[in-house]
């Protein structure tokens, strides 16, 4: 029996129309464009500012584009998984809402929560469903409305984040392509450094939690930066060595778009020139689970069938990892 691999056969993406610039941010908090660009690398970020719209809205836009580009029949979709830290509701899952919006009658669906590392976990999870031989078409989506949890009076965090979504189609192949390997890690000791204080079962919503701004993202930036650099660098180097990849045979690295200095540090550790590293943080900011697929959406036309790509990310938990992918097709599929 031939080995079944899980290959990426298409990508779709969406970012909201409204753009929040550094100039506008500087009117909210004590900062400026030069500081934000130098320290974070963000020039602008897209914000979903229409009332009553959440992550499922952006996920639907991305997935609809994906299905059009790949020519997928809604009845043929077996599974939908959404990685998000900003679900529409605590329940039901954003994935189930997305299935309804896409008219998928034969798919089952669930959410996956691994913060900014969510899409890495999605790729490995979906790949294993494909490898089982029981599933033929899987849509995976990273979607986050980070503006819903950002405190726009906190100069340390509000310049960093944006909203967006992107999706991959994953299908079986017997070619030597697709998700080839992964190294995924978790360390729950990271809780104090990156979390939302209230809103869960430990500290349910109350007048007190709202009045004390406990429903916003809390991040201890210096600690997170240090862990992100070391973790992403180490795991990227490890997966390259494990698979016999060198700086010459790696075609692309797709890092989580959290901070341009983290991205540059990972490239330096891997001895890779920055022209092999996909970077779009300047225009989107950190869209959490959406950063990795949004990078592919932006740079799809650069990719060639058989390209060796290392995806790497770091997020709350702490969660981190790397996924090695051999790309499945040439160039950009038109929508």
Curated annotation (Swiss-Prot):
GO molecular function: 3-oxoacyl-[acyl-carrier-protein] synthase activity; beta-ketoacyl-acyl-carrier-protein synthase III activity
Domain of life of the organism encoding this protein: Bacteria
A Gene Ontology cellular-component term: cytoplasm
Gene3D superfamilies, sorted: 3.40.47.10
InterPro entries: ACP_syn_III_C, ACP_syn_III_N, FabH, Thiolase-like
Stretches the record annotates as ACP-binding: 257-261
Catalytic residues identified in the record: 116, 256, 286
E.C. number(s) listed in UniProt: 2.3.1.180
Localization, UniProt: Cytoplasm
Keywords, alphabetical: Acyltransferase, Cytoplasm, Fatty acid biosynthesis, Fatty acid metabolism, Lipid biosynthesis, Lipid metabolism, Multifunctional enzyme, Transferase
Function: Catalyzes the condensation reaction of fatty acid synthesis by the addition to an acyl acceptor of two carbons from malonyl-ACP. Catalyzes the first condensation reaction which initiates fatty acid synthesis and may therefore play a role in governing the total rate of fatty acid production. Possesses both acetoacetyl-ACP synthase and acetyl transacylase activities. Its substrate specificity determines the biosynthesis of branched-chain and/or straight-chain of fatty acids.
Alphabetical list of NCBIfam families matching this protein: fabH, PRK09352.1
Quaternary organization: Homodimer.
Protein name: Beta-ketoacyl-[acyl-carrier-protein] synthase III 2
Source organism of the structure: Bacteroides thetaiotaomicron (strain ATCC 29148 / DSM 2079 / JCM 5827 / CCUG 10774 / NCTC 10582 / VPI-5482 / E50)
Gene name per UniProt: fabH2
């Amino acid at each position: 029996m031939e080995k079944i691999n899980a290959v990426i056969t298409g990508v779709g993406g969406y970012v909201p129309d409204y753009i929040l610039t550094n100039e506008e941010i500087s009117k909210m908090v004590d900062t400026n464009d030069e500081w934000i660009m130098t320290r974070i690398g963000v020039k602008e970020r897209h914000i979903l500012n229409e009332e009553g719209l959440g992550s499922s809205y952006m996920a639907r836009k991305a997935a609809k584009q994906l299905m059009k580009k790949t020519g997928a029949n809604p009845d043929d979709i077996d599974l939908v998984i959404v990685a998000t830290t900003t679900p529409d509701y605590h329940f039901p899952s954003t994935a189930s809402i997305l299935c309804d919006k896409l008219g998928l009658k034969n798919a089952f669906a669930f959410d996956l929560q691994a913060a900014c590392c969510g899409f890495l976990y999605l790729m490995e999870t979906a790949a294993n469903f494909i490898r089982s031989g029981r599933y033929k078409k899987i849509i995976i989506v990273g979607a986050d409305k980070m503006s819903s949890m950002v405190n726009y009076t906190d100069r340390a965090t509000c310049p960093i984040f944006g909203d967006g979504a992107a999706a991959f189609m994953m299908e079986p192949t017997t070619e030597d392509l697709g998700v080839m390997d992964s190294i995924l890690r978790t360390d729950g000791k990271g809780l104090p450094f990156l979390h939302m204080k209230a809103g869960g079962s430990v500290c349910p919503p109350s007048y007190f939690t709202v009045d004390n701004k406990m429903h916003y993202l809390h991040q201890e930036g210096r600690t997170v930066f240090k862990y992100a650099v070391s973790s992403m660098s180490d795991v990227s180097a490890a997966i390259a060595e494990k698979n016999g990849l060198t700086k010459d045979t790696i075609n692309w690295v797709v890092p989580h778009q959290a901070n341009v200095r983290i991205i540059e540090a990972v490239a330096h550790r891997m001895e890779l020139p920055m022209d092999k590293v996909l970077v779009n943080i300047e225009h989107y900011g950190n869209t959490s689970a959406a950063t990795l697929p949004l990078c592919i959406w932006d740079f799809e036309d650069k990719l060639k069938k058989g390209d060796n790509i290392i995806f790497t990310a770091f997020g709350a938990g702490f969660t981190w990892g790397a996924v090695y992918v051999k790309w499945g097709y040439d160039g950009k599929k038109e929508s």
